[in-house]
Amino acid sequence: MNDLLKGSLEFSRDRSNRSDIESGHGPGNSGDLGLSGFFKKVQEIEKQYEKLDKHLNKLQGAHEETKAVTKAPAMKSIKQRMERDVDEVGRISRFIKGKIEELDRENLENRTKPGCGKGTGVDRTRTATTIAVKKKFKDKISEFQTLRQNIQQEYREVVERRVFTVTGQRADEEAIDRLIETGDSEQIFQKAIREQGRGQIMDTLAEIQERHDAVRDLEKKLLDLQQVFLDMAVLVDAQGEMLDNIENMVSSAVDHVQSGNNQLTKAVKSQKSSRKWMCIAILILLIIIIITVISVLKPWTQKNGA
């Protein structure tokens, strides 16, 4: 997607310059078409994507740490770090969403400028680039949703291992589901508590409870991003279809123009050929007329009579 967006930007600038030249304007006037400020805003969004990547890497690293944690205080510390990162991800995502909506509004406003109407090169450039930005944003948010699913799945696996380690038995799915949902692990560990004493199992109970709270809170925060994801998905699908229609119309227009050019070329060649044969016919006719006149007049007989 990085390559797609960069390619779109480079293609857009090149196309803009060519449009300026064809319309009799110099490259320096490209800012008048609204592309200069447009590209600056796209680059600003790109910088925010880099921040999202950093926070995603931090969250993935922290999640890996939780797999080896067996003490509640350590789990709580990691949870707090992850919550700060997720809060920052939410803030950045809302900022990006606002900037993308701003691009959409400005794209519509820019169509009122001369030479920037709907379907023009400038308009297609802005539309294609904006869609690329949206697709990238959707992909970024999708990565956080994948992380949420991984956390949820691996949380279950960790709980199953903890139960087996303490009790020596594998709990059924219903018991694990209940523990995951409520965080109350005493019931599942009742036999172990009676046999080993509450004191020896308290650390495990506290760690499971802390892990439960961490997963619940992180999942809620990450689910808040789901609405942003859905909003972007709807916009990308709708505008993607619109862009396809524009490109199809442009492609069709190009085909018609090319076909017209071919027909014109054939007509010119045919006209030249017709002129050539007409000249030959006229020349032959002149020769026939000259021969006929000479045959009638017979100038050589007049010379003999004299």
From Swiss-Prot:
GO terms for molecular function: SNAP receptor activity; SNARE binding. It comes from the Eukaryota. The chain crosses the membrane at residues 277-297. The keyword Glycosyltransferase does not apply. InterPro entries: SNARE, Syntaxin, Syntaxin/epimorphin_CS, Syntaxin_N, T_SNARE_dom. It is found in: Membrane. Keywords: Acetylation, Coiled coil, Membrane, Protein transport, Transmembrane, Transmembrane helix, Transport. Residues 1-276 are cytoplasmic. The modification N-acetylmethionine is found at residue 1. Residues 11-35 are annotated as: Disordered. Residues 298-306 are vesicular. Residues 205-267 form the t-SNARE coiled-coil homology domain. It is a single-pass type IV membrane protein. Residues 35-72, 134-162 form a coiled coil. The keyword Transmembrane applies. Gene3D superfamilies: 1.20.5.110, 1.20.58.70. GO terms for biological process: exocytosis; intracellular protein transport; vesicle docking; vesicle fusion. Residues 11-23 have a biased composition (Basic and acidic residues). GO terms for cellular component: endomembrane system; plasma membrane; SNARE complex. Belongs to the syntaxin family. Vesicle trafficking protein that functions in the secretory pathway. Part of the t-SNARE complex. This is Putative syntaxin-131. The lineage of its organism: Eukaryota, Viridiplantae, Streptophyta, Embryophyta, Tracheophyta.
